[in-house]
Amino acid sequence: MEDFKNRMHKNADVQLVMAGVQYLAAIASMAVIVFGNIAEASDAVQLLVATTGIGLALSSFLFLNGAIDGYKAEVADLSSAEAATASGKLLQKQPWMFFRLFGITLTILFIVTSLRAIYS
């Protein structure tokens, strides 16, 4: 059972790292949009860049969502002894909904900003 919990924890960690990498890639694509004059490019290039940016933003949110669900499951699986430790108490106090709202807000802002920069 402990091995299963460790694998699930590692899975949540990997998803969180992937979310971070995807958000960085989304920021990089925003730089391409702004500094590459994509607004003046052909329609096909604009569509390609917009699709890539939206895909990066949405996939980063999906990875973040998966990581949050994994960490929430870990909190639910804490034994009473684990929950009584300082780390257990800290895990139980995490504002999971805030993290989820922050992620979706960041994703929506990125998508709207990208589309406005491309099609303005």
Regions found by a protein language model. Give the residues of each.
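Membrane-associated alpha-helix detector
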Residues: 1-58
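Short membrane-interface loop/juxtamembrane segments of multi-pass integral membrane proteins
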Residues: 1, 5-8, 75-98
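Core segments of transmembrane alpha-helices
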Residues: 24-30, 100-109
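Juxtamembrane boundary at the C-terminal end of a transmembrane helix
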Residues: 110-120
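Single-pass alpha-helical transmembrane signal-anchor segments
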Residues: 58, 108-111
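Membrane-water interface of transmembrane alpha-helices
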Residues: 60-78
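Terminal, low-complexity, charged helical segments
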Residues: 33-43, 49-56, 66-69, 83-93, ...
